[in-house]
A protein has these predicted regions:
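Periplasmic/cell-envelope proteins involved in peptidoglycan metabolism and beta-lactam response
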Residues: 1-270, 281, 286, 358-372, ...
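Beta-lactam-recognizing serine transpeptidase/beta-lactamase-like catalytic domain environment
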Residues: 68, 194-207, 246-291, 296-533, ...
Length: 605
């Protein structure tokens, strides 16, 4: 009996020891071996990684006028694992955020821990929802501080500024090209919630503060942009063109002072914009420039010293057969000087100028002026245009290209080419970015002018400039581009519109004018392009009669704004109305020699 009791006691003790060992091993397994894993699982139920969004940098004009900034909003998100009453939450959230209940219910039916319910909720509206959730003891809905992008000027400068997507990433314009600087770096913090879903602040964990985006200052002057926008709107109203572009640029530095295109769109309602309205036609549209391109042939002939400005060329009395095809002038000219070939815009004269230097050398000058390559402006989507090498030319190409046919150029390329003449023969990269600053205002990058090459000699540039002054006179094709009190140098362009299916569209033209002011000391180069302007009379559809007057109005108002000094005698005779500036700007005064101001109608070309 005693032996039996002793055996039973041993067995019981062994059982207890075995159970104790099992529980001890299990405890050690959970507390030591699996501690990190289960601690992480437990933390996931109550710890939440909150993203602290960096504020996107502001975009400003040259005078610190705001072009794009942020307004604080909140993003409403849900953690499906924390929801304590899905139906009540759906009813409340749908009512407050004006969302369909079915849409919210579908989102919350998943087991995901991060579900975006609605973005860009105004702070006041988010505050009301937050209080109602707390009062009803509903858990699983959280709020993230965010910002929405606002463009205070609506459609003004829309193609340059661009816009962002829902994730605040730039996808067009400066918003895209300067994304690296504007976006900043998001931060985060780990926060712990109690059973009610409220943050336990003392238990706030690791945190990394955000770095806000940098400020980007443009070279554009909003006051000059306003002048250009008003004039391009007036042109759209008067001529109903399919497309239009106006550019102002400082020739010495390449700074873009204004750039406008039509059609356009409101940056704040970009969801309503059509694809055609969102294109920056200044850099992505390819056109045959017409007679504005004649400056290249004239510059090549003079720079190669094949001819002098007063050398005369026989212009065949308006009709010349070359390579089995006829080339016409808009009027019958006999002998014209090189200067007058530009003044009168002779197609035959321009063709003979190109022939004097030869195909290969002429092609090299075309490329030296920057055609056939991107200008390098800090905007996305720029095209290089189309310039074929001489091997791909036909027998008559050498006579058609000098008059701006058989080539494809962008409006910005044509502006830059005219700036070569205004800048003593130097090709400068166009710029839209002035500087990049920290949010505190410290400059981290100030971009300097980039001179690419000396295209032609200063003497040749001066000779071409003298001829272009004659274009804007009662002898030339652009008398209507004149500005009282100032000398203008410029060139008209009229090109039949290219049909995408081949050939040309009958009765449709691209009219343009490129010029600079004052001719002696240029402060800006301007380009006006209208695609398929409607005049009602085909005989009026010329660059000098349509684009020239638009340039005149833009240039006159820009000269007033910049406080450019007109010639003294004319200034007394014609009072100049002053334009008020919205912000202080550097005032540059230039005085040039007297020259007759043409007020007569231009020749048709």
């Amino acid at each position: 009996m005693k032996s039996y009791s002793r055996t039973r006691c041993v067995l019981v003790c062994a059982a207890f020891i075995g159970l104790f060992s099992i529980f001890s091993f299990r405890l050690i397994y959970l507390q030591a071996i699996k501690h990190d894993e289960y601690a992480g699982l437990a933390a996931e139920k109550h710890v939440y990684k909150q993203i602290i969004h960096a504020e996107r940098g502001t975009i400003l004009d040259a005078n610190n006028e705001v072009l794009a900034h942020n307004i604080p909003v909140e993003t409403v998100v849900a953690d499906a694992t924390h929801l304590n009453s899905q139906k009540a939450i759906v009813d409340l959230v749908s009512a407050e955020l004006k969302l369909p209940p079915a849409q919210i219910a579908e989102k919350l039916s998943s087991e995901r821990r991060y579900i975006v319910i609605k973005r860009e909720v105004p702070e006041a509206q988010a505050g009301v929802l937050r209080e109602k959730l707390r009062a009803a003891n509903l858990r699983g809905i959280y709020f993230e501080h965010d910002a929405t992008r606002v463009y205070p000027n609506g459609s003004m400068l829309c193609h340059v500024i661009g816009f962002t997507d829902f994730d605040h990433r730039g996808i067009q314009g400066v918003e895209a090209s300067m994304e690296e600087y504007l976006h900043g770096q998001d931060g985060f913090r780990f926060i712990e919630h109690n059973r009610a879903g409220q943050e336990i602040v003392p238990y706030r964990g690791q945190e990394r503060p955000p770095r806000d985006g940098y400020q980007v200052h443009l070279t554009v002057d909003l006051s000059l942009q306003n002048i250009v926008e008003n004039e391009i709107d007036a042109a759209m109203e008067e001529y109903s063109p399919q497309k239009a572009t106006i550019i102002l640029m400082r020739p010495q530095t390449g700074e873009i002072l204004a750039m406008a295109n039509r059609p356009d769109f409101d940056l704040n309602f970009r969801g309503e914009a059509k694809p055609e309205e969102m294109k920056n036609r200044a850099i992505i549209d390819m056109m045959e420039p017409g007679s504005t391109f004649k400056i290249v042939a004239a510059a090549a002939a003079l720079n190669e010293r094949k001819l002098r400005p007063d050398s005369t060329i026989f212009c065949e009395n308006g009709l010349w057969n070359f390579g089995g095809a006829a080339l016409h002038d808009h009027r019958a000219f006999s002998y014209l000087s090189v200067r007058d070939i530009l003044v009168k815009s002779s197609n035959i004269g321009a063709a003979k100028l190109a022939l004097s230097v030869g195909e290969q050398r002429f092609y090299e000058y075309i490329r030296r002026f920057g055609f056939g390559e991107r200008t390098g402006i800090e905007l996305p989507g720029e095209i290089s245009g189309l310039i074929r090498p001489p091997q791909a030319w036909s027998k008559i190409s050498i006579t058609r290209i000098p008059m701006g046919h058989e080539v494809g150029v962008t409006p910005l390329q044509m502006t830059v080419a005219m700036a070569v003449i205004a800048n003593g023969g130097k090709l400068v990269t166009p710029r839209i970015i002035k500087s990049i600053n920290t949010p505190e205002g410290k400059t981290i990058s100030s971009l300097s002018p980039v001179e690419l090459r000396q295209v032609i000699s200063p003497e040749t540039a001066s000779e071409i400039g003298d001829a272009l002054r004659g274009v804007v006179s009662d002898r030339g094709t652009a008398a209507a581009a004149a500005v009282p009190g100032f000398t203008i140098a410029g060139k008209t362009g009229t090109a039949q519109k290219v049909d995408p299916r081949g050939g040309y569209e009958q009765g449709k033209y691209v009219v343009s004018f490129a010029g600079y002011l004052p001719a002696e000391h240029p402060e800006f180069v301007g380009l006006v392009v209208l695609d398929d302007a409607h005049t009602g009379k085909p005989e009026l559809n010329y660059g000098g009669l349509i684009a020239g007057p638009i340039f005149s109005r833009v240039a006159e108002k820009a000269a007033r704004y910049l406080d450019l000094e007109p010639h003294e005698e004319i200034r007394k005779a014609i009072p100049v109305e002053r334009v008020e500036k919205t912000t202080p700007a550097e005032r540059i005064r230039k005085t040039g020699p007297a020259e007759r101001v043409a007020l007569t109608n231009a020749s048709r070309h």
